[in-house]
């Protein structure tokens, strides 16, 4: 028997499974497009709903007529009976009105939460299956050299075409029936609501009486880390109903403080003075302390529930329906408020946009070298990033005209731009090498370096897709800002290492939805309902984590779990709506 015969059968088995999955998903997604009467039926349904609403309105009018109390004297017994009948009719009318309101709301407010969860599950499942097939088929290359390797390469190319076809169908599905417009409206409504609440909290009428939480920006780390430190402070201030006082004088990046770069976090209350002051000792213990000083998250004890990755209980259903990663969306709202630029910075961004020729379509690539490599992250050559850049441009080409394949390259390695241009002449690289020089360790804590990192983050967040390492705070900040620019940009990235995380976050848990029996010593068993503490995604179809019920750590198929959304009882700041 030829050495690759068994392997080839295995490849055909994978192909069959993949084809079956595509046929099943694609059949469901394109069925409507194959039916020429679909639009007509949908229009008929809408007209029928309008007719029902018209009839229901007439029913209510007649009910209102019957509720009119007749003029003139009536007997007491008859009056009592009439009142009881009126009460029953009023109750029935109230129930019907609520039902009609709900029906009307469903008719105009877009698709249901379950539809959106399912859409994202299909998208994620297809991606995870693709990671798996890529990984497993690539392994077969080493079993033989000639014909097998050629077949494997062809399989990967063909499967890539099919995967992009499914992803394109999913994109168009997400825009059908007014769903795209609904997402835009809902994202704006939620953002406006949260920003009003934050603004209310940060601008008390009487600063001398306001409860305050003091946060010092000078944590011993870089800009992205310091920004996340302030976000952590802000989230706890919001949860404990305290105005955030940001101490930023003698900031390592700008000695004039935060307000010289971004707008003040408050217009009415920047004074930390109060009748009593104390260090954080827990929300309940600090109840009667007016001014509380917060430590860095590493030293926080006791830990309140307001840390990421929790989301507000009162917004959770809307966020789950709207966004693929509600926890990131929630973090992004605090980032949005904090980084409102001063006029000079806004002008600097506009001028840099014109100078660099930044325009769409463009993919953002962030390559972190210097201090991260060898300590917090592994070295990744430019080729690893460009694989995912090319894949996404091929996907974009399915739904738009690509005039040029532009890449915004942000890096702290000044030599990388020329290397990238030499290796990939078919791409247009947009980059400011002076920023790379200023990002070096010897120049890092300067105002010029601050300007550079802010510009890099801005352009990365503006890109159509982001390829980076989530071990880098700069990359995660760009991803967070990206969420404020789109209704749902949760899938607009590929990380070469970590999944998204927030330093100091509470446990990141997933919920098993399918059983799994380990096939080797590296894997762990799953049963539906098991809670898995996720450590990371290997981007090959498998994730690593701990089964909290069994206490076992290992690998498991990524598609067999879903995110466990943690909700937190945050204050709702009803006063902000008055």
Swiss-Prot record:
Pathway: Protein modification; protein glycosylation
Domain SH3 stretches: 505-566
Membrane topology: Single-pass type II membrane protein
Keyword Membrane (UniProt): yes
Pfam families: FUT8_N_cat, SH3_9
Keywords (A to Z) from UniProt: Disulfide bond, Glycosyltransferase, Golgi apparatus, Membrane, SH3 domain, SH3-binding, Signal-anchor, Transferase, Transmembrane, Transmembrane helix
GO BP of this protein: GDP-L-fucose metabolic process; protein N-linked glycosylation via asparagine
Catalytic activities: N(4)-{beta-D-GlcNAc-(1->2)-alpha-D-Man-(1->3)-[beta-D-GlcNAc-(1->2)-alpha-D-Man-(1->6)]-beta-D-Man-(1->4)-beta-D-GlcNAc-(1->4)-beta-D-GlcNAc}-L-asparaginyl-[protein] + GDP-beta-L-fucose = an N(4)-{beta-D-GlcNAc-(1->2)-alpha-D-Man-(1->3)-[beta-D-GlcNAc-(1->2)-alpha-D-Man-(1->6)]-beta-D-Man-(1->4)-beta-D-GlcNAc-(1->4)-[alpha-L-Fuc-(1->6)]-beta-D-GlcNAc}-L-asparaginyl-[protein] + GDP + H(+)
CDD domains: Fut8_like, SH3_Fut8
Segments carrying motif SH3-binding: 302-308
Domain GT23: 209-496
Disulfide bonds: 207-269, 215-233, 221-225, 468-475
Cross-referenced InterPro entries: Fut8, Fut8_N_cat, Fut8_SH3, GT23_dom, SH3-like_dom_sf, SH3_domain
Keyword Methyltransferase: no
Chain residue ranges for the region called Important for donor substrate binding: 368-369
Record topology, Cytoplasmic segments: 1-9
Record EC number: 2.4.1.68
Subcellular location(s) per record: Golgi apparatus, Golgi stack membrane
Coiled coil: none
Residues that span the membrane, as ranges: 10-30
Lumenal side: 31-578
Record GO terms (molecular function): glycoprotein 6-alpha-L-fucosyltransferase activity; SH3 domain binding
One CC-aspect GO term: Golgi cisterna membrane
Annotated family: Belongs to the glycosyltransferase 23 family.
Function: Catalyzes the addition of fucose in alpha 1-6 linkage to the first GlcNAc residue, next to the peptide chains in N-glycans.
Protein name: Alpha-(1,6)-fucosyltransferase
